[in-house]
Amino acid sequence: MQKSSMLKKEAAIARRQWYLVDATDLVLGRLSVKVADILRGKNKVDYTPNVDAGDYVIIVNSDKVVLTGQKALRENWYNHSHYIGGLRTRSGEEMISKYSDELIRRSVKGMLPKNKLSKQILNKLFIYKNDKHSHEAQQPTILELKLK
């Protein structure tokens, strides 16, 4: 009879790796799916849903990410300050040009589970608008995403 084993938190922390992803000409949704899977640890053999076993991800060139179709023109992103009249509306073009890091972060956050682990998982995501980052000491592995 086979025995099933559960991953311990300490073992998961010891095996974490760093990945570097270049977002140049990648579609936002497809990039976000792959990044969310790596952050959760679903690409590992010993995936356990209740343990944060995912790896760290660094995304560079976030301002070169692509929205398909007419989303850059038609989609709007909303923020509210919880004050009267505090609704801010941003178009897709504005989000890509000024807030591309926030656009990717929101997209990845929407693909994570809605529980206590999601904030902890999202803290392992680092997004930079250009190709310079401050994580050379971690020696990240370059992850080539072949997305159509």
From Swiss-Prot:
Subunit structure as annotated in this protein's UniProt entry: Part of the 50S ribosomal subunit.
A single GO BP: negative regulation of translation
NCBIfam families, A to Z: rplM_bact (TIGR01066)
CDD domains, per database record: Ribosomal_L13 (cd00392)
Keyword tRNA-binding in record: no
Cross-referenced HAMAP family: Ribosomal_uL13 (MF_01366)
Disulfide bonds, paired cysteine numbers: none
Lineage, uppermost ranks: Bacteria, Bacillati, Mycoplasmatota, Mycoplasmoidales, Mycoplasmoidaceae
InterPro entries assigned to the protein according to its UniProt record, in alphabetical order: Ribosomal_uL13 (IPR005822), Ribosomal_uL13_bac-type (IPR005823), Ribosomal_uL13_CS (IPR023563), Ribosomal_uL13_sf (IPR036899)
Record-linked PROSITE patterns: RIBOSOMAL_L13
Family: Belongs to the universal ribosomal protein uL13 family.
Alphabetized UniProt keyword annotations: Ribonucleoprotein, Ribosomal protein
Name of the protein this chain belongs to: Large ribosomal subunit protein uL13
Protein function: This protein is one of the early assembly proteins of the 50S ribosomal subunit, although it is not seen to bind rRNA by itself. It is important during the early stages of 50S assembly.
Annotated GO CC locations: cytosolic large ribosomal subunit
Molecular functions (GO terms): mRNA binding; structural constituent of ribosome
